[in-house]
Amino acid sequence: MKITYYIAYALWYLLSLLPLWLLYFVSDLLFFPTYYLARYRRKIVRRNLTGSFPEKDLKEIVRIEKRFYHFFCDYIVETIKLFSMSEEQMKRRMVFKGVDHIVSAMEKEDKNFCFVYLGHYCNWEWIASLPYWCPDDVKCGQIYHPLYNKAFDRLFLRLRNQFGGECIAMKETLRRIIEMKRAKQKCIIGFISDQAPKWNSIHHWCDFLHRETPVFIGTERIGKQVDALIYYADVKRTRRGYYRCEFKPLTHRPKEVPDYELTDRFTHLLEEMIKERPDFWLWSHKRWKRTKEEWIRRQQEEEKK
């Protein structure tokens, strides 16, 4: 594992030293073998797109599909570039709006936490540069799911932690947040909440892109426990290699919001963002691999035991 990690790190770091314009040229070259030869998850992407946009004909679906793969190749080289990107360049290319409003709201409301809903939209890896925009007394964190490949898990942890934030493993989320609460540490924590939960973690379903979809509820559940500010990250790609993330408030008093309403609002906002530019969402993820019918069947079997 260590050898694999050091080899991968050395290769990625050397590639990151190339100027971004040259890396985008590499991205353009990557598109053909990724889409036409390797056909990386083509069936999954096509199935996800056709189910999400039943009103679009095949020609339009294929157009979105190809634009997604072009962006996916950009995402790869942009992520590699993070290994050597300077703070100045990072702040020029990944701009955050609304951080000052979050910080002032934390002071005004006497809150230690702000939880931010995120999706796999645009380059979510660049969101890890948020600490560059925060005052020293406000810590940043992100909840992540460890990768099965230990070498690449270590590689991505190094990549995400280099900006001064903290990666919190999903299973350690509540414990770590309680530790920070006891220490009275102010913290902005990002929750990527558009993945498919495991069967035993499904508690709520949303209407998302024309399908009943199981969703994570941890953001609002833990947010209510620690009385966090709840925000949503509205991310846009302004042009190639440039992004803007605007933090928009959902509530400053989560305990007063009915259960699942915050999750539903996030899901709706994410859907609207995807509809505006569908090529920037991660369509290669098996988002709808768990159906409500199968979930109900499993629930009924559990009740019989």
Model-derived features: positions:
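A conditional alpha-helix N-cap/helix-loop micro-motif detector
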Residues: 92-99, 149, 170-171, 212-213, ...
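Catalytic core of membrane glycerolipid acyltransferases/transacylases, capturing the structured
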Residues: 110-171, 198-207
